[in-house]
């Protein structure tokens, strides 16, 4: 059984989708990042970087419990555990892992900054807004070009790389992106989001999504001194 510590964010949804696709049993433990639950000592034992998702597998290697953080590592682990969504063919495997790292090192961080400066920052900084809007569009362009030559992002089959990227592409309006400018990407994204397991994964903790802007207290926890306090 997987105990999953998560919240309804793109990084959480990656792992939700993978668990739904594989059918591995899991329990959800909400970690309300707006309330500061990611700084709780028990959570930090699992995720020392105070980020979610994180998980504990009670039936890890050798039948012993294992805890994990970083969503990309979790996807690789779950692929290994299930034998699914990471090809055995070495060329396909390493291509898939390359595109997974593209998400971890590029898509997630850069689109996250676009979300912040275009939507959350307390002041509008034109340089930052333009910087991350342009970077978002550059990344969408990279994906668009890739999908013109490959049915899926990692190789010719659906893999953890697709699961990692697609949740970040659900909110192009928050990133300064006109999605219709990337028709191949849009078609691929929508095809994946129509998968039953992807639908279920994106609905995990959907009732906890914030309907409006963050409160001042939440902003302090997420973006202010609470986030950067030494622990």
Give, region by region, the residue ranges found by the protein language model.
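GST-like fold's C-terminal all-alpha helical module
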Residues: 78, 100-196, 231
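GST-like domain detector, emphasizing the conserved glutathione-binding G-site
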Residues: 1-130, 230-231
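Short, solvent-exposed turn/loop segments enriched in Gly/Ser/Thr/Pro and often Arg
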Residues: 32, 160, 205-208
